[in-house]
Amino acid sequence: MPTNNQLVRCGRKSKIRASKSPALNGNPFAKGVCVLVKTITPRKPNSALRKMARVRFRNGTCVNAYIPGEGHNLQEHSTVLVRGGRVPDLPGVRYHIVRGVYDTQGVKNRKQGRSRYGAKRPK
């Protein structure tokens, strides 16, 4: 335990937390290009075919990003916007693609939670 004099001289160092989305370099979003679009299966109690894209950023970094919502129009060379946020049952997927920006269309016929999926208000 430090003495009062030591605390006055040096103070306490705060712990540096590791980032959960290091490829974004502290930015909220990053623009990238799809290198690969595929489906993968989730971890054990769950069963599905989850849609995923491998995205290359401008600085050359590649990440695995989840494509949320039902149906998508992404293919190789599509430009996408990526945000942080992991998918709990997909190992190695720590990013999400933002729907309704650049080449990614919003989810069709979406009535609730539209802002998360880039869907316009139905008339």
Swiss-Prot record:
Any one GO biological process: translation
Keyword tRNA-binding: yes
GO molecular function: rRNA binding; structural constituent of ribosome; tRNA binding
3-methylthioaspartic acid PTM sites in chain numbering: 89
Xref: PROSITE patterns: RIBOSOMAL_S12
GO CC field: small ribosomal subunit
Keywords: Methylation, Ribonucleoprotein, Ribosomal protein, RNA-binding, rRNA-binding, tRNA-binding
InterPro entries per record: NA-bd_OB-fold (IPR012340), Ribosomal_uS12 (IPR006032), Ribosomal_uS12_bac (IPR005679)
Keyword Ribosomal protein: yes
SUPFAM superfamilies named among the record's database cross-references: Nucleic acid-binding proteins (SSF50249)
Transmembrane segments: none
CDD domains: Ribosomal_S12 (cd03368)
Binding partners and assembly: Part of the 30S ribosomal subunit. Contacts proteins S8 and S17. May interact with IF1 in the 30S initiation complex.
Family to which the UniProt record says this protein belongs: Belongs to the universal ribosomal protein uS12 family.
Task of the protein: With S4 and S5 plays an important role in translational accuracy. Interacts with and stabilizes bases of the 16S rRNA that are involved in tRNA selection in the A site and with the mRNA backbone. Located at the interface of the 30S and 50S subunits, it traverses the body of the 30S subunit contacting proteins on the other side and probably holding the rRNA structure together. The combined cluster of proteins S8, S12 and S17 appears to hold together the shoulder and platform of the 30S subunit.
PANTHER family given in the database record: 30S RIBOSOMAL PROTEIN S12 FAMILY MEMBER
NCBIfam families attached to this UniProt entry: rpsL_bact
Protein name: Small ribosomal subunit protein uS12
Organism of origin: Orientia tsutsugamushi (strain Ikeda)
Gene name tied to this protein: rpsL
